[in-house]
Curated annotation (Swiss-Prot):
Keyword Repeat included in the entry's annotation: yes
Intrachain disulfide bonds: none
Biased composition (Basic and acidic residues): 11-24, 520-533
UniProt cross-references to Gene3D superfamilies, sorted A to Z: Kelch-type beta propeller
Protein name per UniProt: Kelch domain-containing protein 4
Stretches for region Disordered: 1-33, 50-69, 348-381, 405-433, 482-533
Record's compositionally biased regions (Acidic residues): 487-519
InterPro entries per record: Kelch-typ_b-propeller, Kelch_domain_protein
Keywords of the record: Kelch repeat, Phosphoprotein, Repeat
Organism: Mus musculus (Mouse)
Name of the encoding gene: Klhdc4
Pfam families in the record: Kelch_KLHDC2_KLHL20_DRC7 (PF24681)
């Protein structure tokens, strides 16, 4: 009895500490949230201009991570919502809704009036009732400089049959958070964990909430037993036995002033309905057999039709006093919930007959050249210099290098064939974290995510597919060359250093401008089907930087903005014209 009493007392003490920390974080973050609420309201004003549902065929979505990818419960479609992208200087937040048709291999952008505000690191769960519903809770909005965060505590449902968003207003729900996990269990949503962060403080959660899909009411659970410590980004999935599995995740704690230590968890728990009445649950810690994933965070999770739980990718951070380096993964682990066993997925590779056939088709006779086989050599990039006049009459000169793709040059039939073959020769996703996963008809889809190359963050927009029945090879559905991604931080530092050196040497402004023009004349390309507003939003920092270099450091921001928009519009119009000419 004495021991039990001590444990209960200790548990209540931990709850009080967590409550104090939450109050402290909430108070300090309120000012930040007020600032961000104004920015969120601005974006919502733009969204309010949408008065009807529009469905527009489009290219694959732009690079992003921490979005949600969900399989439609009735149609052969995947639903992509939200996410974020960082280009080295600015963080972009999204609330776009895309539909990927599995049968047609096409993307459609769906604009619906009254959508949820822009967010990432939310949770989305699909349920079959009413022709299919996508339930979205929480997530975060980051300021453009990535220094401030607003954590949502709102609940939304997308009615897939009617394509309408609805905000569900119900009291007693979880506090604002991101990185939490949520699953559908019978006719309930069950939510666990997550974190809330301000500029100076943070708190991780281990609480559990349920939301009834019948009464639309939140309830906070108080499971018996020792459960997981507070964490975010964990595995959460329903097992065949009706329990809820929790594995891994990430948390951090302050070890001294301005020094935090992160923990990559590798423990596993089951949350089970307990005997003794409805609404009673119990935690049980388990130790499955087999080979579980190595220590990591940022992994992605999906559930296969046979209740096998899939874990893909992630990153293992190695922390030192003032540095953080990560090793990224592209491996796939499977947890067999029926046998309580982990194992690493092994791909068999394509059948030997297919290999031979591909090899015979792809290889050229020894010694042949592209001209001998009927191919055409790639055209040289074309440099174009033009003057642009902004609204206020400012005249600037921009230099643009048009690459073969920018000129609308089509690859030769041979190149098409080889690209088609490459998409099915087992090219696997590169190592990454925070990717989006979904399973439909026994096929695993992996979209986007990110990895780091030195100080640079590369955000991905590729899409891969793996047949979980055959387990032979990955198929590439959308390709991406990470080297083609714009990164502004590196070029800025180089220009700043060169500018400082030139100032010290006493060189004049004209020499400085010409040096900058010659350093990076190539501008961001326009994607097929992209509207100017989308192009400007994606590339705005590039044009602002270029405009500032032309009008000088003393120019007002309004003037710089006008010049930047004029330069972007000129480049956009030229690209659209080139694409149109290439079609004829």
């Amino acid at each position: 009895m004495g021991k039990k009493g001590k444990k209960e007392k200790k548990g209540r003490g931990a709850e009080k500490t967590a409550a104090k920390m939450e109050k402290k974080v909430s108070k300090r973050s309120r000012k930040e949230e007020e600032d961000l609420e104004a920015l969120i309201a601005h974006f919502q004003t733009l969204d309010a201009k949408k008065t009807q549902v529009t469905e527009t065929p489009c290219p694959p979505p732009s690079p992003r991570l921490n979005a949600s990818l969900s399989a439609h419960p009735e149609k052969d479609e995947l639903i992509l919502f939200g996410g974020e992208y960082f280009n080295g200087q600015k963080t972009f937040m999204y609330n776009e809704l895309y539909i990927y048709s599995i049968r047609k291999d096409t993307w459609t952008k769906v604009d619906i009036p009254g959508p949820p505000p822009r967010r990432c690191a939310h949770q989305a769960v699909v349920v079959p009732q009413g022709g299919g519903q996508l339930w979205v809770f929480g997530g975060e909005f980051a300021s453009p400089d990535g220094e401030q965060f607003y954590h949502y505590k709102d609940l939304w449902v997308l009615h897939l049959a009617t394509k309408t968003w609805e905000q569900i207003r119900s009291t007693g729900g979880p506090s604002g958070r991101s990185g939490h996990r949520m699953v559908a269990w019978k006719r309930q949503l069950i939510l666990f964990g997550g974190f809330h962060e301000s500029a100076r403080d943070y708190i991780y959660y281990s609480d559990v909430y349920t939301f009834s899909l019948d009464t639309f009411q939140w309830s906070k659970l108080s499971p018996s037993g020792a459960g997981p410590t507070p964490r975010s980004g964990c595995l959460m999935a329903v097992t065949p036995q009706g329990s809820i599995a929790i594995y891994g995740g990430y948390s951090k704690q302050r070890v001294k002033k301005d020094v935090d230590k992160g923990t990559q968890h590798s423990d596993m728990f089951l949350l089970k309905p307990a005997e003794g009445g409805e609404g009673k649950w119990a935690w049980t810690r388990i130790n499955p057999s087999g080979v579980k994933p190595t220590a990591r965070s940022g992994f992605s999770v999906a559930v296969a039709p046979n209740h096998q739980i899939l874990v893909f990718g992630g990153v293992c951070d190695e922390e030192e006093e003032e540095s953080l380096e990560g090793s990224f993964f592209s491996d796939l682990y499977i947890y067999d919930a029926a046998k309580s066993r982990w194992f690493a997925a092994q791909l068999k590779g394509p059948k030997s007959e297919k290999k031979k056939r591909r090899r015979g088709k792809a290889e050229d006779p020894e010694g042949t050249t592209e001209q001998e086989t009927g191919g055409s050599s790639a055209p040289e990039p074309l440099e174009v210099i033009k003057e642009v006049v902004s609204e206020d009459g400012t005249v600037v000169t921009i230099k643009q290098v048009l690459t073969p793709s920018g000129l609308g040059v089509q690859p030769s039939p041979k190149a098409d064939d080889s690209a088609s073959e490459a998409s099915s020769t087992g090219q696997e996703p590169c190592p990454r974290s925070n990717a989006m996963l979904a399973v439909k008809h026994g096929l695993l889809y992996v979209y986007g995510g990110m990895f780091e190359a030195g100080d640079r963050q590369v955000t991905l927009s590729d899409l891969y597919c793996l047949d979980l029945h055959k387990m032979e090879e990955w198929k590439t559905l959308v390709e991406m060359d990470p080297k083609s991604q714009e990164w502004l931080e590196e070029s800025d530092s180089e220009e700043d250093s060169s500018s400082d050196e030139e100032s010290e040497d006493g060189e004049d402004k004209d020499q400085e401008d010409s040096a900058e023009e010659g350093a990076d004349p190539q501008h961001p390309e326009v994607a097929r089907g992209e509207q100017f507003e989308e192009y400007l939003s994606r590339t705005e920092q590039h044009w602002l930087k270029l405009a500032r270099s032309h009008v000088g450091p003393e120019a007002k921001e309004k003037k710089v903005l006008k010049v930047a928009q004029a330069m972007a519009k000129s480049c956009f119009d030229d690209a659209v014209q080139d694409i149109a000419q290439a079609r004829h």
